[in-house]
């Protein structure tokens, strides 16, 4: 995790622990620079990250203010860190269906920008929230980047392992959303009937150097999944 990201996390934790509400004012820029012993540019990047996440808003000449917290149980479509943190107040578990090393499908190779002869980790799992099915997930990880996975890792947060275990820096993602109907396989794993509605998300996650490392296809249980996009000047 880069320094500005670490500071952003600490500021966000401070907001949560002190139960700050929308409109509460945070320390001024100079105070934050002194507190964290970093340059103005680093603090500015931290605040920009928090603003993009919807945690704060800045008013020129007035200061830095807390923004209204998003509702509990909603998954942010703007997060690059996986959705485990969005659901930290809930019991999120995973059931691993498949985990192996194989060659990519043409679709995975294209989205990961790799050759058909390169190895990938293929992961198929079902995610649960408080014991109820949340989503059915198929993921392809470039093995030359994500060098090791096992059942224990895949049963928990893969992104936490990628950041903390492998020391990789996750940069940005591209998400493609579709509304459709569950096929037989998806319905079976989600405990629903085929033909019921689903939100289907294809995601491509990249490192900070722009290299894609994860291509995932996720079908969400419409009864259990809720999403949020907190728009700001970066999106409008």
From Swiss-Prot:
Q: Which UniProt keywords apply?
A: DNA-binding, Transcription, Transcription regulation
Write out the GO biological process terms: negative regulation of DNA-templated transcription
- Supply the SMART domains for this chain: HTH_GNTR (SM00345), UTRA (SM00866)
Residue intervals passing through the bilayer:
none
Against SUPFAM superfamilies, the record matches this protein to: Chorismate lyase-like, Winged helix' DNA-binding domain
DNA-binding region(s): which residue ranges?
A: 29-48
| CDD domains registered for this protein in UniProt | WHTH_GntR
Question: Under the GO molecular function aspect, what terms does this record hold?
Answer: DNA binding; DNA-binding transcription factor activity
Extract the Gene3D superfamilies matched here. Chorismate lyase-like (3.40.1410.10), Winged helix-like DNA-binding domain superfamily/Winged helix DNA-binding domain (1.10.10.10)
* Keyword ATP-binding attributed: no
HTH gntR-type domain residues are: 1-69
- Signal peptide positions on this chain: none
Q: Which PANTHER family match?
A: HTH GNTR-TYPE DOMAIN-CONTAINING PROTEIN (PTHR44846:SF4), MANNOSYL-D-GLYCERATE TRANSPORT/METABOLISM SYSTEM REPRESSOR MNGR-RELATED (PTHR44846)
Q: What is this protein called?
A: Uncharacterized HTH-type transcriptional regulator YydK
């Amino acid at each position: 995790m880069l320094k500005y990201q670490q500071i952003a996390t600490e500021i966000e934790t401070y907001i949560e622990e002190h139960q700050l509400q929308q409109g509460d004012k945070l320390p001024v820029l100079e105070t934050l620079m002194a507190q964290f012993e970093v340059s103005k540019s680093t603090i500015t990047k931290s605040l920009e990250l928090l603003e993009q996440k919807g945690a704060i808003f800045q008013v020129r000449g007035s200061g830095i203010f807390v923004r209204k917290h998003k509702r509990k149980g909603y998954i942010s479509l703007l997060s690059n860190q996986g959705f485990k943190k969005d659901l930290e107040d809930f019991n999120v578990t995973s059931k691993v269906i498949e985990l192996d090393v194989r060659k990519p499908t043409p679709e995975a190779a294209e989205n990961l920008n790799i050759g058909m002869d390169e190895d990938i980790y293929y992961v198929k799992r079902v995610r649960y929230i408080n014991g109820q099915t949340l989503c059915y997930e198929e993921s392809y990880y470039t093995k030359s980047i994500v060098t090791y996975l096992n059942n224990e890792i895949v049963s928990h947060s893969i992104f936490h392992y990628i950041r903390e275990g492998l020391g990789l820096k996750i940069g940005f993602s591209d998400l493609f959303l579709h509304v459709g109907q569950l096929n037989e396989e998806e319905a079976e794993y989600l405990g629903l009937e085929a033909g019921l509605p689903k939100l289907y998300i294809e995601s491509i996650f990249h490192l900070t150097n722009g290299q894609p490392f994860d291509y995932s296809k996720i079908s969400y249980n419409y009864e259990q999944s809720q999403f949020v996009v907190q728009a700001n000047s970066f999106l409008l």
